[in-house]
A protein has these predicted regions:
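Single conserved hydrophobic/aromatic residue that forms the stacking wall/gate
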Residues: 1-12
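Amphipathic alpha-helical "stem/stalk" segments
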Residues: 17-138
């Protein structure tokens, strides 16, 4: 009886992980597609060219970055609950850090919103930023 229920528990856990991975993939795709919005694309090109952003472009990028950070925080929670394995989380964590490479706008967004995130997640983001601090130009 306990072997059967344990086996059933394993099935539910695998199904939960599969559903979680699907949810993560869909959320990632949504954020990626949102980043293809013409306003955001123009703004990203201006950032690359070191050109001044319009107010609309900056606001759009700030909202988009905040959505990305919230999605990553959700992945952090899923990892803590065992829905994401260590390798998947490690990959996501690295991707999170790349958002700050030579990007003072994203750094400013993070510094202004950090207190609204889970403290443990905030510490992870700060560690990822610290590893890339030599990419920031004054």
């Amino acid at each position: 009886d306990t072997t059967w229920s344990r086996g059933l528990g394993d099935v539910y856990k695998r199904q939960g992980k599969a559903a979680s991975r699907q949810s993560i993939a869909e959320a990632h795709q949504e954020v990626t597609l949102a980043g293809l919005d013409p306003l955001l694309m123009r703004a990203k090109l201006k950032l690359i060219k070191k050109e001044k952003l319009s107010i609309d472009e900056e606001v759009g990028l700030r909202i988009h970055m905040t959505a990305i950070l919230r999605a990553r925080e959700n992945h952090f929670y899923q990892h803590k609950m065992g829905m994401l394995d260590d390798e998947e989380w490690k990959t996501m964590r690295k991707a999170l850090g790349t958002l700050f490479i030579d990007n003072n706008l994203n750094l400013d967004i993070w510094n202004k919103s950090k207190s609204t995130f889970n403290p443990e997640f905030a510490k992870i983001v700060d560690e990822e930023i610290d590893m890339r601090k030599d990419t920031f130009k004054k």
